[in-house]
Amino acid sequence: MKKIYFTLLLVFSCTLIFAQTTKQQAKLDQKAKEMEAKVIEWRRHFHQYPELSNREFKTGKMIADHLKSLGLEVRYPVAKTGAVGILRTGKPGPTIALRADIDGLPVVERNSLPFASKEKATYLGQDVGVMHACGHDTHIAILMGVAEILAGIKSELKGTIVFLFQPAEEGAPEGEEGGAALMIKEGVLEDPKVDVAFGLHISSQTPVGTVTFKPEGMLAAADMLKIKVKGVQAHGSAPWSGVDPIVVSAQIINGLQTIVSRQLDLTQAGATLTVATIHGGVRNNIIPEEVEMTGTLRTLDNTMQDEMHRRIKRTAENIAESMGATAEVEIIRGYPVTYNSPELTDWAQPVMERVAGKEKAVVIKAVTGAEDFSFFSQKVPGF
C-alpha cells in the first residue's frame, strides 16, 4: 500500500506540471521503485521514534535536514515543529502543495517488531507510551521520498512544489495552537501562493494495493461538546429536597440521541453524536450539585453541522429546565469537513487508475473520521 500512495503523490505532482508521455511515466515508476527501500527505512525509523503533537522536535529536524540536503529552500521550524521545503523550478507553472502529517499518539505499542516504539512521554499529566498508530510515519517517509525524486528531476519540471510536513494533526495540547490551522496562519499557502493541495492517509481497513477516494465531502467535521448540568445538592435519603443533576444528565444523553435518529433527514447527510465522559459526585450518599459531560459531534455537511449545534443546545437546555435544573452548552468547532474538489477528483481519477489499476481505484462513501487537511482544502482546491 505504501508503494501505491508513494507513486500516486509523485505522479500527481508531475502530471499537474507537465503532460506525461508513456516514456516519462515509465521513468517515474522506475524512480519510485528505486526509492522504495529508502522510504521503508525512513518509515521504520520514524515508527521507532514517534513524538507527540507539538513535540515533534527530532522528527522535524530530521525532515528539515533531509530537505536541505536536496538543495531545497527550507523553512524550519514552522507551526512550532513542522518543516516546509520549496522546490522552485524557475519556470512558469502552478504551485502545488504536498502535505504529510508527522505526529504520533499516546498509545503503548504491544508487538515484537524490531522497530517497535519504546518511547515514553507525559500526556495530560500522565506517563504514556507513544506510537505512530495512525500511519503518520508512513506519510512522512512517502513525502521525503517524493521530495528527493522531484528535486532530482527539477530541470524537467515547471512551476513550484511546496512540501508541507505538518505537526499536530492529532490535535495540539490544550491551550496551544498547532496543526494545519497554525501553518496557514504562518503563511505556508501564501509565499509562494499555492494553487492546489494534495494529501493522503493510509488505512489498515483498505486492502493492500487499493486506493480509495470520494469527491466533495470525504471526511467529517469534528466538534467537541461540553455540557454542564447544575442542580441542587441534597442527601441521598431525601432526593426530593434537591435537583439531581445525574438523573437530568441521563435524560439529556437520551434526548441527544433522538436528534440523529428521529429529527434529521439522514437521506441528505449523516451525523454521529457521542457523549464520552460524565463526571459528578463525591460520595455515594450525596446527590451532587453539578455534572459535567463531554462528547464529540461528527457531521458531513456544513448546513447539517449548524443545525446540529442548534438542536443540541435546545435539547439540553429544555430538558434541564423541565426538571428544575440548568444546562450550559459549549460546542467547540474542531476540524471542518474535508472537501475534495470535484474538478481535482475528476482529474486525479485516471491517474489513480493508471497507478493502482482501474479496479483498485475505488470510490467510497464518506468516512466519519476527521482530518485537519480540511483547513488546507478550505483555502485552496484540495484532494
Identify the role of each PLM range:
Residues 120-131, 137-138, 149-150, 155-277, ...:
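Histidine/acidic-residue-rich, glycine-tolerant segments that coordinate divalent metal ions
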Residues 46, 85, 98, 136, ...:
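Divalent metal-coordination and catalytic microenvironments
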Residues 20, 69, 250-383:
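Metal-dependent amide/peptide-bond hydrolase catalytic core
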Residues 20-131, 141-158:
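Acidic/His- and Gly-rich active-site-bordering loop/insert found
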Residues 33-37, 50-61, 133, 137, ...:
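Soluble non-cytosolic domains of exported or imported proteins
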Residues 35-39, 43, 47-50, 70-71, ...:
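Sec/Tat-exported extracytoplasmic proteins
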Residues 1-23:
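Bacterial Sec-dependent N-terminal signal peptides
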